[in-house]
């Protein structure tokens, strides 16, 4: 019995286990990859600096936006970690991706030019912001699954010394009121 499926999104095929998180529409993944990718391409100071993919899930941002960069993918979910190891196998083998099996809040941060964080609805909160700011990023891209937690986390990032440079609202669920804000700080 196989406990995973494959989805096409972000220009490639992904393995997703039954208990791993993945957007319910591949078109939604494509939209997020496009928005986050444009922010990184436009606002990161150099094209190949190190990147942290926080709350990495199955590895979407590590292997789309992170191409051409060395990436540390931080994830705590066991099934997501297993999927990420499969999805990122070639990049793990060539040393351009390292997986950190940890909750972001307990992870020992490493310096990174870019941080991409896509937390669950609860958001980053103080501990997530505190840890990720220790990476000393030049660019911090926050994907918000909930507008209230995004607003709280954006305020925490501003208090930590960052400035909101760009905000895009992505309609991942057409016909509903749910949207996902994506901010570049």
Regions found by a protein language model. Give the residues of each.
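Rossmann-like S-adenosyl-L-methionine
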Residues: 1-185
